[in-house]
Amino acid sequence: MSRPRRFSEVSGFVLAGGASRRMGFDKARLPLGSESMVGRQIRLLRAICRSVSIIGPPDRFPDAGIQVYEDEIAGKGPLGGIHTGLRRARTEFSLFLSCDMPLMDAGFLRYLCEQALVSRASATVPPPWAKGVYPLCAVLRRRVLSTVRSSLTLGQNQVGRFFKKVQRRTISKAEFARAGFSPRIFYNANTPEEYQKVRRQLEALHNRTRVGELGAFPVSSGERSGRT
């Protein structure tokens, strides 16, 4: 059997610079089985991207084994992390993934990259879910860097607002469903209760190969509000 494709045109970045206020401690380093939340995202991206880096404080990830970039513009949230990643990327396309979506499916990330390379859109994004909030998972081209920078300068730090400014390919909900994916992959673990729920499910089903086989999860507060 041939190995799944790795995209030489795509750099991968894990966004892990959040303050984790609702969790109460650093959620990126919370354990999920034999790996951490950030470690799981690194593993997914390594199977898909040419290179993988973390955007976050280097002192929080001394044993990451990959490059860790501090936010070049502090206090701007995920969009600030995207700015740093685009400036550091050595490829035309960059895949950004939040550290706090522990049910993410590598198959969907690969699908997102495929659609980005076919469409050549400035941004290729998942469908917006509850209250129109976009999951923090997207493929962006280097040419959007100027738009990111101007948004940050204007204090417009919301990722969803930025998406609406650029030419984008949005995966529709119908297309998402036809491709066999579940919205469960966008579940955010932002509180201790949400984390424990995910941890129990993953530990109970550690032999399953697809996250899509997991049971139902409610929409988390993070999906409703877009906060981290």
PLM regions: where:
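SAM-dependent methyltransferases
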Residues: 1-11, 118, 192-228
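Nucleotide and nucleotide-moiety/phosphate-recognizing core
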Residues: 3-156, 161-183, 199-206
